[in-house]
Each structure stands twice: as structure tokens, then as C-alpha cells.
């Protein structure tokens, strides 16, 4: 094998001593049903051939290294290597390409999202031949999917446990997120739940701080849940954040929540770790707890268009690892989300079979082989005027979380919750009657205001509040 030692002028980049194309670029390869497929957006360094860059990604994320080693002869590299089988330019972008790579199933440990990510994205992102690299999508074959439990319960079982059908679920993140005592925190939870919400939520960074230790919070929130259930006759819940500094502490918190008889706990799956999340999901399945997942830290990984990991991949990873809810963006609120792309990964979270559709960012057809679905959670800067769009975009199988849009009501938390509940039911009824919420949503809300003073007050407060900025992909 001829070494490459040429230094590219003006870049200081040395292509290395091994030509990956000879082994790992295989455009004639026929993809197998059992292969794990990856679509990488890559930006090669100046002077690096695109085929070499694609082959390098395949090599460094599977069996390759920078030189030939004698132990290559002790195994069958042709059986275990990743293969770059196709490369296409990204329309409208200079020097950006989508590299399609197939990985044999035997490269991965069964039931381990941690091992899957360690192999595919663990090392290759620092490769010198690439200026930038982004994992856009993965195809998980049924043969691998079947090695995972997935979400503890899934959407249908959650509805059965809650006895709530025919509409989206309503939630609220308690604010201020930090600083309240446990008793005052529980009071805020109670007011929201008795006003008409289905759930309230710990914020992602509420764990066990000096002003509110986790055990005290769990106790006061459980009291709020039971009191509001007795008043309303509905099943209520609060996402008790079980994320902790150690896996042992995390499991202790989940165990305490189970002992209290509450229906749901919460985990920050990226900061807490995928291994910890899978363990918690298995515990929740075995003990009848729903599991709400927050995606804290996701934007560090997924926000840049040319480097990192797209959220659709993180969403697929979570569905494998296990979670009944996952924050997914809103399209209409303060947090970023483009409509068609967001709907693409929302479908990947909750549907069983999703066809390839590049207009929605779906690079591969995904068959989840009856793995339970994960309910998307829309939150971040939304209020009652957004309700028609949210019902139109997400449909019924979603949890709509109004934090400031509940607690910011001028008459208090319970009235804010009532306003959101009235708006949701009015929009759901209008949709069921065949009305076009995208065009008539404002009229639906205004009509509902006539018989809900709480909604009328909310509409007056938030009538001018908008979050209109371009997404990062357009900047």
C-alpha cells in the first residue's frame, strides 16, 4: 500500500500514511437488512479527496487505524469493517457531502446505546482529515432494535394508566426553577394540577440543592398530587427529577417515588448518561412508573448545522434507551425548531414505521419492530395563543408544557392552568369538527374566551408575545 506523505500547501495538513479508500470505500456494496446505516455530513480539509474522507470516517468508526497492523491478519476485516458505500454533495453548500456508511451488526453490543454511540461517534469527530462532521441520521435495523426494551410503557399504556384519551396532555414546569422551599414548591404544583393540568414538572436542574432537598420535594409534591386528584377526580402527576450524582442515588430516588405511589419520574438523559438512563427505564418498566426525559445539553451537541449530532439521532437513541416522554421543541415558541424537520423526528419518536423522506430530514426508512413509542413534549415560550398551532402540528399524542404560560397568569397558577385546559379542549373540539386551526385558530380562542374569564385574561396578557428569530440553520 503506497503511503501518502504529501503535505497540502497552505493548510499544514498531512494526509497520513494509509489510504483508506483502498479498503473502506466500497460503492458497489449491497446494504444488508441487518446493517446499521449512518448518514454523516462531512466537510473535508482542503486537498483531501471526498472518497478518502468518507472512507476515513468508516474506518475510524469501525476497524481501522492510521496504519497497517500485523493483527489485521488474525481476523476477517472484510466481515467486520464499516463501509462507505455512497457519497453525495449537499445542495447549496460548498465542500459539504453526505457520506453513507454501513456497519455490520456484530460490531455492537446488544441492548447498549452507550456502545453504539462509542463506536459510531466516539472518536472519529476529532479526525484531522475532516474540518467538520455531523451525524445526520441512523437506521437501526429490527435485528438490533429487538435487543432493547425501549420506553418503559409507551403512549397507549400511558393513556390507559392516566385514563385520558382524545386530546393532548397538558403540563407545566414550576418556576422559579431554583430557590423555592419544598413546601412552597408543592403549593405551586397543587394549584396547577387542581386548575386543570395533567402534569407539573421539575426543571432539569432541580435535583437536591440546599434550599430544597429531593426527599422533601418528593413528599410535598406527592401531597399535592393526591389532594388535586381528590378534588378533580382525574389522575395527576409531577415529573419528579431522579437525576443524581451517582446511579445509586438516582435509583434511590426512583424507589422513593414508587413507595409514595406517584405515577411518573424524570431523568436528564444526556447529562445523566445513557447507561444510567437505560437502567432507570428498566426499573420503571418493572415497577409501573412512567419516565419523563429531559434533553438538557442537547444544543451543545446538535445546534450547529455542520458539526455534531442531529437531534433526530439523539431522539432515536432515547427511544432505544427508554423514555415515555421526550422534549422535542415546539416550532412556535422560544426554543429552536423548524416545522418539517421537527415533525420528522417527532414521527420517529412515536410511530412504528417511518418512510425515508429527505424533505423532513429522514435519510432512512426506520422500522421500530413494535418498540413502544415515546410521546413528544412541546415546551419553551408557549402560551394560549399558540394552542391552535400546537394542536394542529402535534395532534393528540403530545404533551404541551406551558411554564410561564401557566404561572404568569395575572390571577395565579390555577387560573393559568384553567386557561390552558379550556384552550386545548376548544381547539381539539374545533379540529374534530373539521375546522382549519391554521386559519381559524384565533377565532376559536376568541370564542372560547366568552365563556372562560381565565382564558380571556390570559389572552390579554400574552397577545403581543412572540419569539421571531431565524433558526441557526438560516444564520
From Swiss-Prot:
**Single GO term (MF):** magnesium ion binding
Q: What is its EC number?
A: 4.1.1.39
Prosequence residues removed at maturation: 1-2
Q: Where in the cell is it found?
A: Plastid, Chloroplast
InterPro entries the UniProt entry points to: RuBisCO (IPR033966), RuBisCo_large_chain_AS (IPR020878), RuBisCO_lsu_C (IPR000685), RuBisCO_lsu_C_sf (IPR036376), RuBisCO_lsu_fd_N (IPR017443), RuBisCO_lsu_N_sf (IPR036422), RuBisCO_lsuI (IPR020888)
What reaction is this protein's catalytic activity? 2 (2R)-3-phosphoglycerate + 2 H(+) = D-ribulose 1,5-bisphosphate + CO2 + H2O; D-ribulose 1,5-bisphosphate + O2 = 2-phosphoglycolate + (2R)-3-phosphoglycerate + 2 H(+)
| CDD domains hit by this protein | RuBisCO_large_I
| Cofactor binding, note field | Binds 1 Mg(2+) ion per subunit.
Please list the residues that make up the active site. 175, 294
- Tell me which cofactor or cofactors this protein depends on: Mg(2+)
> Where the protein is mainly located, per its record?
plastid
Site annotation (Transition state stabilizer): which residues? 334
Q: Which residues bind Mg(2+)?
A: 201, 203-204
Role noted for this protein: RuBisCO catalyzes two reactions: the carboxylation of D-ribulose 1,5-bisphosphate, the primary event in carbon dioxide fixation, as well as the oxidative fragmentation of the pentose substrate in the photorespiration process. Both reactions occur simultaneously and in competition at the same active site.
- What interactions and quaternary structure are annotated? Heterohexadecamer of 8 large chains and 8 small chains; disulfide-linked. The disulfide link is formed within the large subunit homodimers.
Protein name, UniProt field: Ribulose bisphosphate carboxylase large chain
Upper lineage is: Eukaryota, Viridiplantae, Chlorophyta, Ulvophyceae, OUU clade
